[in-house]
Every structure is written in structure tokens, then in C-alpha cells.
Amino acid sequence: MQNMVILGATGSIGASTLSVISANPDAYRVYALVANASVDKMLALCITHRPQVAHMVDSQAALALQAKLPPELNIQVSSGEDELIALVTATEVDTVMAAIVGAAGLVPTLAAVKAGKRVLLANKEALVMSGELFIEATKASGATLLPVDSEHNAIFQCLPEEVQANLGRCDLAASGISHILLTGSGGPFLTAELASLAAMTPAQACKHPNWSMGPKISVDSATMMNKGLEFIEARWLFNTQNDQLKVVIHPQSVIHSMVQYRDGSVIAQMGNPDMRTPIAHCMSYPQRISSGVEPLDFFKVGQLSFCEPDFNRFPCLALAIAACAQGQEATTVLNAANEIAVEAFLQGQIGFTHIAKVNEACLSSVPKRAMTSIDDIIALDAQTRIYAREQLAKLA
């Protein structure tokens, strides 16, 4: 029986994780649920899954949850960063699902890694921001790191065992690998007229053709910044050079990514677009458990198509690839700028095409600094957010 902590329990990844746990009740136990401020959602999850601890990042939300929880459930309610770190590093905890969206997930995820936990990484921003520090912490602690993102999980499944066992430190060329092919659907605006993009609304941007996701990642998919962040994450997870990574547009989201070998072979991982599949794989690796997902029906799949990304349509993807080549400081700046810009777009403060403009302005203007600690990363992140908000004021 594995005791699990779910960071981001009220989000879409949290819901999918709890679904897999419910399908395998003899193998997994919900030790703790962690959320930001969604009291009613957390209350419902507590009643259903009976965790030992419910942690709310927002202190007022924690008080509200405590008042609403039936006392007979005997669930401890906590709040605060120190309490969260103590939770993910507790000796009772075996596995941590790291699914808090954005920079907010970095500190608890890194704490779980340093404690040597089995970490299921759905928070791509942790690697985008801290890259080498994160990988070195994994190596030092002996933590098990497993990628949950559908693309990185697909790549992982297509790799030989010696690479799977050495994430972040592997040598792809030595294992006969020539390229990693990172697939992406192109999002809801793949075929939209370029001139129409400036007028796209948050509702339109969040209407992904294949996946059910939260608002932030949905907008990132529409700009293809999500694929850019995944490009950066893949660079660290699989220790790649930029020329070993290629982005392929695949609108149907049936092939989740591919690995191309030196002998001309290409191994692909396929399946229905449902996050329960990669979550179940990570939870049970190297074994397999039921995810509750229907298997792919090849007689109903139809045509699979592929094309190269259009960087005029997706400037955020181009920015991310360029930032990856520049190094850790640039990717930290880009992530912070993008979080501010996307939130402003979702609130109706800026237009869709302004997201890329804010990101580009921050990348070109925020002074870079050497980053040797988590404090350096947090400081650069904070500095970038201030500058990004200044750019928003100019666009308003």
C-alpha cells in the first residue's frame, strides 16, 4: 500500500489521479490532499477520499475548510509553506503527485525530491525554473522521478531501460537515439486565420479540441507555450541537446510522442487522450495497473496527420526554444512572464496576441543573473513578474 500526497488535488490532474486511486484501492491510499483555495471542492474530496491531512495554501481557506469538515472524519487541516514541506517530506509518505500549476509548485516539489520520495512530476514549471538544481537534487537524494506529462511519459515509455533509470543524466547517443519527437496538437487555433488571433477570447482559447485541462494550461496550449515548456522540460529530463529535440504538430493527439533511433526505427506511444493513462503508468511503474481508460480502437482512429510548427502562428513556442538554448536564467524569466501574461488574458486585461509580446519583452529586458540556489531562482522569478506587470500597464 502506497501512501500518496496529491499536490493540486482540486485541479484536473488531481481529479484524474484520484480516479486511478479509486480504481486500485488495494494498492494506494490518499494520505494528504493539497489545494490552494477551493474550499468546497476540497471538502467534497475529503468526504470521498478520507485523507489524513487536508492542506490549503490559503490560510483563510484552511479556516473555512476546518469549519465545514465533519469532525467525525478526523482530518487534520493545515496551512503554510513550512507545514506543506513537512507534509511532503513526512516518513509516512511514499509518493508525491506534483500537480500544482506554475511556479507555486516548485518549493514543495523540490522538497519531496530532496527527501528521496517517489515524485510523479506533472508540474513542468519546476524543471523549467530550476533545471540543473532539480536534477542534481534528484541524484543526491536518490529520489525516483517519473514524468506525468503525456508527452514526456510517452517518451519515457519509448526509451531503453538504461535511459529510464538515469533521467537527467542519460546519454541518448550512447543508447542509439538520434532524436526525440515531441508531439503537440496545435491547440484550438491551429487552422484559424492569423488575422483573427488578436480577437480570440479566453473561452475560445480554453476550448481544446482533444484534452480536458485547466484554464492556464489550456491557454498555454493555444499559444503552444505549453509545448515550449515541455521542450525545456524534455531537455532536462532526457539530458538532450537542442538539436536532439524536434516538435511535431499532430492534431489528433493519438501519438503522444516518439523516439527516433540511429538505425531508422521510430518507437511511438499511442493511446486515447486521457491523463489517467500516464498517471497510472507513473503510479505503478515498472508494473501496470488499470487506469479506467478505454483502449485505442484502431478501426475508429481514422487518419493521423503531421506537420511542422508555424512560428508565425506560435511565437511563444519559438521564444521557448530560444530560451532553452540560452540557459536556465532565460527559461526562468520566460516562465514567470508567461504566468503573468496568461492570467491577465484570462481576466480580460490583454488580448491573446499580447501574451507573446509580454513574454518577448521580459526575455529581452530583464537582467539575467547567475542562479546557484533556489533563492536565486525565486528572486529572478519575482523580478520578472514585476517587469511583466509593468508591460501589462503599457498594453492596457
From Swiss-Prot:
It catalyses: 2-C-methyl-D-erythritol 4-phosphate + NADP(+) = 1-deoxy-D-xylulose 5-phosphate + NADPH + H(+). Mn(2+) binds at D149, E151, E230. Disulfide bonds: none annotated. NADPH binds at T10, G11, S12, I13, N123, E125, G214. GO terms for biological process: isopentenyl diphosphate biosynthetic process, methylerythritol 4-phosphate pathway involved in terpenoid biosynthetic process. The keyword Glycoprotein does not apply. The keyword NADP applies. Signal peptide: none annotated. Pathway: Isoprenoid biosynthesis; isopentenyl diphosphate biosynthesis via DXP pathway; isopentenyl diphosphate from 1-deoxy-D-xylulose 5-phosphate: step 1/6. 1-deoxy-D-xylulose 5-phosphate binds at K124, S150, E151, S185, H208, S221, N226, K227, E230. Its EC number is 1.1.1.267. Its cofactor is Mg(2+); Mn(2+). Keywords: Isoprene biosynthesis, Manganese, Metal-binding, NADP, Oxidoreductase. It comes from the Bacteria. GO terms for molecular function: 1-deoxy-D-xylulose-5-phosphate reductoisomerase activity; manganese ion binding; NADPH binding. Belongs to the DXR family. This is 1-deoxy-D-xylulose 5-phosphate reductoisomerase. The gene is dxr.
